[in-house]
Amino acid sequence: AYKITDGCINCGACEPECPVEAISESDAVRVIDADKCIDCGACANTCPVDAIVEG
């Protein structure tokens, strides 16, 4: 599954890109539900600050 690092600026660009709605908003950053993530990489490809990594 992909994960969102501390580099996240909480811009929200990734959330609508996720085909399985695995991304949600938390206090400071977005979070990815690893149980829902299908490893498609759509979120990582759209992140403007490269804060989403595989693993």
Swiss-Prot record:
GO terms for cellular component: cytoplasm. Binds 2 [4Fe-4S] clusters. [4Fe-4S] cluster 1 binds at C8, C11, C14, C47. The keyword Translocase does not apply. It comes from the Bacteria. Its cofactor is [4Fe-4S] cluster. The keyword Ion transport does not apply. InterPro entries: 4Fe4S_Fe-S-bd, 4Fe4S_Fe_S_CS, 7Fe_ferredoxin, PSI_iron-sulfur_center. PROSITE patterns: 4FE4S_FER_1 (PS00198), 4FE4S_FER_2 (PS51379). GO terms for molecular function: 4 iron, 4 sulfur cluster binding; electron transfer activity; metal ion binding. Coiled coil: none annotated. Residues 2-27, 28-55 form the 4Fe-4S ferredoxin-type domain. Keywords: 4Fe-4S, Electron transport, Iron, Iron-sulfur, Metal-binding, Repeat, Transport. [4Fe-4S] cluster 2 binds at C18, C37, C40, C43. Ferredoxins are iron-sulfur proteins that transfer electrons in a wide variety of metabolic reactions. This is Ferredoxin.
